Design a protein with these regions (language model features):
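Secondary-structure end/capping motifs
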Residues: 91-161
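Hinge/capping helix and adjacent helix->loop/strand transition within the periplasmic-binding protein
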Residues: 1-5, 13-28, 92-93
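Pocket-lining segment of extracytoplasmic ligand-binding domains
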Residues: 28-121
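Short glycine-rich phosphate-binding loop at a beta-alpha junction
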Residues: 5-6, 84
Length: 162
């Protein structure tokens, strides 16, 4: 039996489905809900669970410790990032200002690279210089509507009962 750390009813739950379908393991795969990525990384370092979904820079930190990638969300062909505003009253001016600021940040990060922001990454993500140097060249996308194929995949996942 294998145990995967992920978050239920989320992108990592959907991606776990894709990975299990692709890998066709002999034994049952159990999903445990570990929402905090920092906790997942510590569990990986302590060999507590078989597989984990990690975002950057935690994924870079895990790879530095000779762990293996068995499935990458980048290879799944699905784009699940979203900015959601959940207010009872739409605040279009504030939403537009947020989108403009977000898109400016994306332009700056894509222009300068994530490693340019090493001090911020180290401060808020609690990683060292070696981890920052190991980060891949990540390119971010601006705010835009979701792709129809991604909406359909998410809808099918949520309504299928897995």
């Amino acid at each position: 039996d294998k145990i995967v750390a992920m978050t239920r009813y989320s992108a990592t739950d959907l991606l776990t489905n894709l990975a299990v379908r692709k890998g066709k393991p002999k034994y049952q795969v159990f999903r445990v809900q570990i929402n905090d990525v920092m906790v997942r990384l510590r569990m990986l370092q302590n060999h507590e669970i078989d597989a984990y979904w990690l975002a950057e820079p935690q994924a870079a930190k895990a790879l530095q410790a000779d762990n293996n990638v068995i499935f990458s969300s980048a290879d799944a062909g699905v784009h699940l990032g979203v900015v959601a505003v959940m207010d009872k009253v739409r605040r279009q001016t504030e939403e537009a200002a947020f989108a403009e600021a977000y898109d400016k940040a994306v332009d700056q990060i894509n222009k300068k690279g994530v490693k340019y922001y090493a001090d911020l990454i180290k401060k808020y993500m609690k990683v060292d210089d070696a981890t920052v140097r190991a980060l891949p060249d990540i390119k971010y996308t601006k705010i835009g509507p979701p792709r129809r194929s991604d909406l359909l995949m998410a809808h099918n996942f949520l309504t299928s009962g897995k």
